[in-house]
Amino acid sequence: LSHGPKEKKESDQVDNVGSAEDSKTSKSESDYLINLNNLAKEKKIDSLIGRKLEVERKIQILSRRTKNNPLLVGESGVGKTAIAEGMACLINEGKVPEIIKDTTVYALDIAALIAGTKYRGDFEKRLKAVISFLKKQNKPILFIDEIHTIIGAGSASGGSMDVSNLLKPALARGEIRCIGSTTFQEYRGIFNQNQALSRRFQKIDVNEPNFDDCMEIISGLKPIYESYHNVNFSNESIQAAIELSSKYMNDRFLPDKAIDVIDETGSMLNIERNNNKKVNVQKKHIEKTISKITKIPEQSITAADKKSLKALEENLKRVIFGQNHAVETLSNAIKLSRVGLR
């Protein structure tokens, strides 16, 4: 009997602590969602340039009655996020069909959604509130970047209830339209393993753009970087950025790596300037930036391809002895590859 009141007192303290924690961690749905339409109005999202086929397919999927959820799958840096966020820009500019003209695009912040969910049921409560909020909106579109992260996110130890399982019913009924993005590796290894979730999405392959598409994309973004760095980019410098980044930065993909080269070149010239006059970016400046990024000497980057290819077999035989047949086969393969025959 002597321990009864004490136990009650301790339990009261625990309840009070729990309620205090709940009051601290309680947030509105807007804290977990980012309104991309508002960001587009404030010019905080770059306009979508090119990618006509991918945009058309995405709009077709969004206009379906059910399973109207496009999934953008492509390598890192090919522009998946730009295609998804660019939808908000297209809506604001009125460049979309009537059926999705009045829609609002929201980006889900999964980190904020999970942060602070200490007790079982906190996470589910938050996500249910977000889903309920979206259902009340006029034609909402939910964008989840790196969508493979929702599988297992927020699940308690030993539990199977995560973001993906809570979203499935709303996605199946078409109550919420969702745009997802992920890489080929994550799609095959994680996302596609969850068949119940993956069949609710329609896959759109986002491949690396070719040279002409890259020129169109970067030429469209050129005024933004010129204004930011107070420089002028010539077509020759943009062409050099695409060609040299494609040649020497093999671990990354266009257009991201070419845009990075353009951005860093503008930054370099902006730092080195002695006055406020606009600097004209030339091919040599692009070559200097590529050299710094890849650690390849500028002389190697600026060397003429024709001369180096012409003397390739001879130069290899000078340093490799007793392997003439292998050297000839290798040099022939390189020459064929360079002219686009293999």
Residues of each region from the PLM?
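AAA+ P-loop NTPase nucleotide-binding core of proteostasis motors
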Residues: L1-R342
